[in-house]
UniProtKB/Swiss-Prot annotation:
Main location group: nucleus
Organism name: Mus musculus
GO biological process: ribosome biogenesis
Pfam families linked: AARP2CN (PF08142), RIBIOP_C (PF04950), Tsr1_G-like (PF22298)
Underlying gene: Tsr1
Name of the molecule in the record: Pre-rRNA-processing protein TSR1 homolog
PANTHER family for this protein: PRE-RRNA-PROCESSING PROTEIN TSR1 HOMOLOG, RIBOSOME BIOGENESIS PROTEIN
Length: 803
């Protein structure tokens, strides 16, 4: 008889622990030779003592403090670029000439020099503070000048009114600046000294409470006397600088002087010479240069002339009047600048970046999955000759794709043709009759007009065509909110032909969809990264670690930009700013940009997808007609027909590549020329494979209801359409799911089975899906906007018409 032996799964009671008497030898026996993970590591993490931790923390604080002080010392010093200050008056009552007169403070030993060729800026030199400023201004209504100057300004000086702070134009200006990215700023109040001494304290407290909404915990400075201007200048010199990510990794320059040399072939194109101080990063002559609002260009060479605004000019010591001294210094230095002109770098054609923006597809490589124009015409002829629809399936297509891929010659790859715009006129008539009467009366009561204002004078300010167009948009937006994605099945065209590009999905979230399937021909013109995130990290790492060759930060240089139209220098001579940014690798090439934006709460005008909008993306400005889609983490994203104010959404558009982070502002041009802020956000990704899926919902009515069966009508109007869409799953608004069993008759009635009994008031729905692509509507030219003025009449009249 064999003895009993315990198996490996027998019960093992918990061993008694010896407590403090547990020795090291017993611990080794318990471990049974197992080695801890820390001993296996090659590099042990050294545990610092408490004294070493304190020492390391103090060293880190010292390094941060030294870096901040070094940045302060460089900006505005003799070795760095001048401290560029943008003065923005936020109220119409503010006197800008008076503010400039106070800022030209001679009590601190400053020297004033008028900028040659421009009346909008001046240089301010202060040897006692070892600082130099370059002051310029922008009116809040001048949108392009304001945003362009804010891109390169080191500090923005906001001038506030002592009573109201800012008006409607100033508030609109702040909304745009906050969305673009605000650099270092300072708040100054002008005109407070005109109040009685007892009321000055109350006015300042009231203004501080008002300013807290936009600028929490910020101190208000005064600008009424020379002493207050001196305090303001010291604040500007010692203020900690805020960083804007999109400009810290690029070299940029504000043009102080611009000259144009026409080419031998034509007087309309030539070499543009722009002079200014290099900021941001080292400027390489082989990189491309983007002139804001004008496009991308190549540089021929970089010159290094003498700095025309030195902090300590030699002639100043031998003169009595500071203004005269600087004038003598500049006039004497002018011929020397030509003699001492040094060529810093010349472009190397082998290493210079190309201006190629689009890819050139090779038709022999078979890159295109979209048929040619000849194939589309042949498909149209075949459809006209044959009575039945024949499916053309590409080679290698799965059975799942073959179920829904048809001839695509009848429908444009846009949003859905004229049938997408079919509206429920009867519903809108009922909607206009039903509204809440009390609210309408209140709105009408608030629209009180003076008796002296005649109706004909009021009508002169109202555009009847614009009102009709806006009313139609409001109707479409309200229908989309009430019945999202629902569409009436057309009766003059068979549904299987009308929706031949659409397919059914078992689940919008989990069903597969190939992102490379049936791409449009425009996708052959763009560039795509194998891994955009890794490429971005690599480029940014090279910027931080590599020592670039070229013009260092703070140098006064002259850039020779080739093949520039003469309109650029004419734009500068009219008083507009000229700003240039260097481009990172690949940033001149076209791709698909996805931007996450949110609706501006100050704008309630309905905006439909594929309407032309104006984009301010980082340092670029362009026009395009984008797609709107939901911002989700899935692989498929639902197309949005209108902008929504309740959540963030993604805007997809063809545009040049830009590496995030970069701010995004969306404007819409009104018929009077003004640009209205629609949405704000940031650049999300550069990804052509991001799928935007448009959904169409066909609805039907349960005609006869049985236990789990029902006869549905009005979804289709012929037997062939019922058979065609039979594989697609049905759903109801009350949560039931079902399938089409068989058609009944020849008028589109069909027998359907569901997972439960239907209610008589329920609606049967069918979801169809199609991938949509953005249109190639990129236009780098953006017209200058009319100065922004708040208009209450148009919004009020639209509300009255809607009633």
């Amino acid at each position: 008889m064999a003895a009993h032996r315990s198996g490996p799964l027998k019960q093992q009671n918990k061993a008694h622990k010896g407590g403090r008497h547990h020795g090291g030898g017993s611990a080794q026996r318990d471990s049974k030779g197992r080695v801890g993970p820390k001993i296996l590591c090659k590099k042990l993490k050294r545990q610092l003592s408490r004294i070493d931790q304190r020492h390391r923390a103090s060293q880190l604080r010292k390094q941060k403090r030294e870096s901040v002080l070094a940045e302060k010392r460089q900006l505005g010093s003799k070795d760095g670029p001048p401290h560029q200050v943008l003065v923005v008056p936020l109220h119409s009552r503010i006197s800008l000439p008076e503010a400039f007169k106070l800022l030209q403070n001679e009590d601190l030993g400053t020297v004033y020099l008028s900028e040659r060729g421009s009346t909008q800026s001046f240089m301010l030199l202060c040897p006692s503070l070892k600082h130099r400023w370059f002051f310029t201004y922008a009116r809040p209504g001048d949108l392009h000048t304001l945003l362009d100057m804010a891109k390169v300004a080191d500090t923005i000086l906001f001038l506030l009114d002592p009573l109201e702070g800012w008006d409607s134009t100033g508030d609109y200006c702040l909304s745009c600046l906050f969305a673009q990215g605000l650099p270092t700023y300072t708040l100054a109040v002008q005109g407070l000294s005109g109040f009685p001494p007892k009321k000055q304290i109350d006015a300042r407290k009231k203004l501080s409470k008002m300013v807290e909404k936009r600028f929490p915990e910020d101190k208000l400075l005064l600008l009424d006397t020379q002493q207050e201007s001196g305090m303001l200048l010291r604040q500007l010199a010692n203020q900690k600088q805020r960083h804007l990510a999109f400009r810290d990794r690029r070299a940029y320059l504000f043009a102080h002087v611009a000259d144009f040399v026409p080419s031998e072939e034509s007087d309309l194109v030539g070499t543009l010479k722009i002079s200014g101080y290099v900021r941001g990063r080292t400027l390489n002559v082989n990189s491309l240069l983007h002139i804001v609002g004008h496009g991308d260009f190549q540089m021929n060479q970089i010159d290094a002339p003498v700095d025309p605004f030195p902090l300590n000019p030699r002639v100043i010591k031998s003169q009595k009047k500071p203004n005269m001294a600087m004038e003598v210094c500049v006039t004497d230095a002018a011929p020397d600048m030509e003699e001492d002109l040094k060529v810093l770098m010349k472009a190397d054609p082998d290493h210079q970046e190309s201006l190629q923006t689009e890819a050139i597809p090779d038709p022999m490589e078979g890159e295109q999955t979209w048929p040619t124009e000849e194939e589309l015409d042949e498909a149209d002829d075949l459809l006209k000759q044959r009575s039945r629809v024949v499916k053309k399936v590409p080679k290698g297509t799965s059975s799942y794709q073959a179920e829904w891929i048809l001839d695509e010659g009848d429908e444009s790859d846009g949003e859905g043709g004229e049938y997408d715009d079919i509206q429920h006129e009867g519903f809108m008539e009922e909607e206009s009759q039903d509204g809440s009467g009390e609210e309408e009366e209140e709105e009408c009561e608030t629209m009180t007009l003076g008796e002296s204002v005649r109706d004909d004078l009021y009508d002169e300010k109202v555009d009847a065509e614009d009102e009709e167009r806006m009313l139609e948009k409001y109707k479409q937006e309200r229908l989309e909110e009430m019945f999202p994605d629902e569409m009436d099945t057309p009766r003059d065209v068979a549904a299987r032909i009308r929706f031949q590009k659409y397919r059914g999905l078992k689940s919008f979230r989990t069903s597969p969809w190939d992102p490379k399937e049936n791409l449009p021909r425009d996708y052959a013109r763009i560039f795509q990264f194998q891994n955009f995130v890794n490429t971005r990290k690599r480029i940014f790492k090279e910027i931080e670690e590599k020592e670039a060759e070229g013009a260092e930060v703070g140098w006064y240089v002259t850039l020779h930009v080739s093949d520039v139209p003469v309109s650029v220098v004419e734009y500068f001579r009219q008083g507009a700013p000229l700003i240039a940014f260097s481009l990172l690798p690949y940033e001149q090439k076209m791709s698909v940009l996805n931007m996450v934006v949110s609706r501006n709460p100050g704008n309630t005008e309905p905006v439909k997808a594929k309407e032309e909008l104006i984009f301010h993306c980082g340092f670029r400005r362009f026009r395009a007609s984008p797609l709107f889609s939901q911002h989700t983490a899935a692989d498929k994203h639902k197309f949005q027909r209108f902008l929504t104010a309740d959540a963030a959404f993604v805007v997809t558009v063809f545009a040049p590549i830009t590496f995030p982070p970069a701010s995004v502002l969306l404007f819409k041009q009104r018929r009077n020329g003004m640009h209205s802020l629609i949405a704000t956000g940031h650049l999300f990704s550069v990804d052509p494979d991001r799928m935007v899926i448009k959904r169409v919902v066909l609805s039907g009515h349960p005609f006869k209801i049985f236990t789990k069966m029902a006869v549905v009508r009005y979804m289709f109007f012929n037997r062939e359409d019922v058979m065609w869409f039979k594989p697609v799953e049905l759903r109801t608004k009350w949560g039931r799911r079902g399938h089409i069993k068989e058609p009944l008759g020849t008028h589109g009635h069909m027998k359907c089975s569901f997972d439960g009994k239907l209610k008589s008031q329920d609606t049967v729905l069918m979801n169809l899906y199609k991938r949509v692509f953005p249109k190639w509507t990129y236009d780098p030219y953006v017209p200058e906007p009319v100065p922004w003025v708040k208009s209450d009449i148009s919004s009020t009249v639209s509300e009255v018409d809607m009633e």
